[in-house]
Amino acid sequence: MSTFKIKVANFFARQSCAAWQPNRIIRAICRQLYRFIMETDAKEYPYADLKFANWPESDGDFYTLVTDSSGFVIRRSTSYVAWLMKKYCGNSPKLPKPWTRKPGEHRFDAKHWGEILEYNGWQKVSRAEWPSYRDIFDERHFIGIITDTDEFGLLVWFNNAGFNITGSPVIWLVSTYKDFKEQNLEIPVSEKSGIIWYREPKVKDI
């Protein structure tokens, strides 16, 4: 994205934050404007450029967090996976109504995403249905939730699986957003990995 577009988007993003703009209506308008600039026609995750919203983050009285069009704080695994859902599955996730937050929960918490995925028709799978390389050929998408990673948990997007000579998967190849950057991880296929897998709904399940 051009430097000019980033500067314009930054202007509106800053004005969408309560720290700099006290008027709620103006904040809402500016929020829609920077999202339009950043997300329209984007082929990859649109908030990866660290020149956008490059100020210190705060969710206290001096609120400076910036969210995507799904309402998730940018450069978190939740925002990243929500973007991949839109890119590969056709729709951004819808939040349950009313959205009841648990004590201490923030918009970028990944560990509570089970209820969001189920609300959008995704199905929690058993060990027998864990993702494998066959799902790549069948174009089945999976999202994994790791609840005990850091304070907020972590979402991962299944990309592929490595397998042994018998054809059994031994490594999950996933992508996620961690430490404010996109990362590709290799995770052992094991219950010890602590991943809770969800599979996108089939057409007949929608």
Language-model segments: which ranges?
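...with weaker cross-activation on analogous glycine-rich loops/strands in unrelated enzymes
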Residues: R101-S175
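Compositionally biased, intrinsically disordered low-complexity segments
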Residues: A9-F11, A28-Q32, Y119, A128, ...
